[in-house]
Structure formats: C-alpha cells, structure tokens
Amino acid sequence: MYDTELPEIFLIIHGTGTMMGKAKYGNYFVIYQGCTIGASHGKYPVIGNGVSVTANASIIGKSNIGDGSTISTRTTIFQKDIKANHTALIDFETGILKLKPSKICYAQQFFNVDLNII
C-alpha cells in the first residue's frame, strides 16, 4: 500500500489534501495543496523532470507530462499528453483545456540548478 516511488528531488508546498499515487515522477517535481495524481483503469501518469502541479489540479490515468511543464490551478488532465515546456490550464468560462508554450519552467524558482539542462 505504501509503495509509491517518489523522485530523489521534489517539493511539496502546503501539502494538505494532496494525494500522490503510483505515477512515475521525474526529479525537480513541485506539487501544491489539494492535488491528485491517480490511476484510471490501473494506468498511472508519467511525469517528466521539472513539472509543477499547482493548487487543486489533477493528473489522472495514462498521461505523459513533458519536462518543464506546469498544470495550472484547478486543471484536470485526464488521459492526455502534455508536451514539454507547456502550461496546461482550464478556461473557467468554457471549461476547455488550453495548452500554451512556456518560456520559463515554473519549478525553476524552487531549485538551485538550471532545469533547462536536466
């Protein structure tokens, strides 16, 4: 039951209510409060290096989250791949998931290494 493998280098910020399932996590992973990383039909996400999951966001099922990407507040990724260096965010008016290229890795601010070369 307690066999989730976490990366060597990660940061949990205000971790209350956060559930981290048996996904594959890359290093320099950042996760905030109220987040869920979980399975759908026994398939878990694969999360790259330097990924950030902000407050109340979720990644569920067979998803590949590319290096340096951010899952924005209250955004759910369900069995969807996110390219490296992109921000996934939900348009609260339409409920549509939007993907935007990111010039700066959000996780970079928390670690004293250049995540662009990891």
Language-model regions, residue ranges each:
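Extended, small-residue-rich solenoid/repeat segments and analogous flexible loops
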Residues: 1-21
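Short "repeat-start/strand-capping" segments in structured domains, especially the N-termini
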Residues: 23-27, 83-84
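Active-site-proximal segments of catalytic enzyme domains
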Residues: 28, 34, 50
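Glycine-rich hexapeptide-repeat left-handed beta-helix
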Residues: 39-42, 47-118
